[in-house]
């Protein structure tokens, strides 16, 4: 991918993120708590998550392996951090899910397209288009790297713990919804989304990559409206007093 193509992709993805942000305040993505048959054909939720998330893991792996900097310390570490998240998201998280919920095929396919494009954005910059000499070993001793990596792992910890809290709300066979109360859910209604946003802000800080900042924009554009919808749903089901002053 050339520099001009890369810059066009960043601009296009940024513009699309703004459109998605607005649209999701009017249209609830029909997966998880908002699953509805109106979205048409659906697939097993576990299979859907694997097929949706695995492409970005594989695209990043391909771009890294074919680059000349693949074993340089900084790019290699960036690669490991990115793949750590997506290995868990693609090949562990889906199989920890409980229940027999479904994922609309349309949402899965849109997720595949986004993840392929995001993998291209991240990998092209980190392994091919970053200015020569930028990501030397000295990068790993910069304040931005250390601040970013701390944020990254704090966010990952919040995300993983919040997912665990959600999974353990129900006993086997129970299909009711419950208001999560532990961990970050004491402060926000979507602790898992908050953790993921912090995680990718950390990645953007530690890499100073323009592609990573576009991904932060996308993460916010996708998750903030959904967090708002979930908060409203909790208020409807459990009452405003139960939800309290938790942020979205």
PLM regions: where:
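Membrane-helix and juxtamembrane interface regions of eukaryotic multi-pass membrane proteins
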Residues: 1-87, 92-109
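Hydrophobic transmembrane alpha-helices
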Residues: 2-23, 60-71, 114, 136-248
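Juxtamembrane interfacial secondary-structure elements that flank transmembrane helices
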Residues: 23-35, 87-91, 100, 125-131, ...
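Short, solvent-exposed loop/turn segments at secondary-structure junctions
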Residues: 57, 100, 122, 159, ...
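Active-site pocket-lining segments that scaffold enzyme catalytic pockets across diverse folds
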Residues: 93, 106-125
